Design a protein with these regions (language model features):
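Metal-dependent peptidase/peptidase-like ectodomains
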Residues: 2-14, 51, 64, 90-91, ...
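Soluble metallo-hydrolase cores and metallopeptidase-like ectodomains found primarily
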Residues: 2-69, 81-88, 92-94
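Alpha-helix N-cap and loop-to-helix initiation/capping positions
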Residues: 70-74, 148-151
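Short amphipathic alpha-helical face segments that pack within enzyme cores
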Residues: 73-81, 108, 112
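A structural signal for isolated positions on well-ordered beta-strands in alpha/beta enzyme cores
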Residues: 96-98
Length: 178
C-alpha cells in the first residue's frame, strides 16, 4: 500500500519542487487511529408490488475540515423531507431510504450493506439515487452515470435529467473517469 496524507498547499509545493530536483520525499506523521463501530440507518415504506424497490441514500458523516451542513446535512434533510411527503401513501414500489455511515472514509456503510444482500435482494432494486451535497451555492444539476453500471442506470439518468429540464434546469452529464 502507498501511504497518503493531506498537506498544506505550501508543503505540497515544496514536495513537488524537491521531487523535480530529484530529492527523495520523506513524510513523517503523528497520527492516532482507532477502530470504531458505526451504524447505517434504513427506513422503508412498503409498496404494493412485490420485488420492486426504489432506493435513495445519503451519508451521515462529513469530512473533518467541513461544516457538514452541505456535505451531507443537505442530503439527509432532503431524504427526511421526502419521507415526510410520502407519509401515508402506498407507492407501487417499496421506497427504501439508507442513511449511510462511513462514506467519507471509504463508503464503508454502503459497501457493507451491498455485501450482505442476497442476489434476489439486489435484483429487486430498480434504481438507486444518491443524494449528496445538494445545497451548495456553487452547485449544478448533475446526473452521474457510471459506465458499466447496472442495467437500467442509463434509463434512470435520462429520467432524472428530464426532471431537471422540466423544472427549468439544464442537466449536466458528468464523466467520473477523466
Amino acid at each position: 500500500s502507498i501511504p497518503a496524507a493531506a498537506v498544506s498547499q505550501g508543503a505540497a509545493e515544496a514536495l513537488v519542487a524537491a521531487a523535480e530536483d530529484g530529492e527523495p520525499a520523506r513524510l513523517v506523521t503523528d497520527a492516532h487511529t482507532e477502530q470504531a463501530r458505526t451504524r447505517t440507518v434504513l427506513a422503508e415504506l412498503p409498496g404494493s408490488a412485490d420485488g420492486q424497490v426504489i432506493m435513495l441514500g445519503a451519508h451521515l458523516d462529513s469530512v473533518i475540515d467541513g461544516p457538514g451542513i452541505n456535505d451531507n446535512g443537505s442530503g439527509v434533510a432532503a431524504l427526511l423531507e421526502i419521507a415526510r411527503a410520502l407519509g401515508g401513501t402506498r407507492p407501487q414500489a417499496t421506497v427504501r431510504m439508507a442513511f449511510w455511515s462511513g462514506e467519507e472514509l471509504g463508503l464503508h456503510g454502503s459497501m457493507r450493506y451491498v455485501a450482505t444482500l442476497a442476489q434476489s435482494e439486489k435484483d429487486a432494486i430498480l434504481v438507486y439515487a444518491n443524494v449528496d451535497m445538494i445545497a451548495s451555492p456553487n452547485g449544478f444539476a448533475g446526473v452521474y452515470d457510471e459506465p458499466g453500471a447496472a442495467v437500467g442506470s442509463a434509463t434512470a439518468s435520462e429520467l432524472l435529467g428530464a426532471a431537471v429540464t422540466r423544472n427549468g434546469g439544464t442537466p449536466v452529464q458528468v464523466n467520473l473517469h477523466g
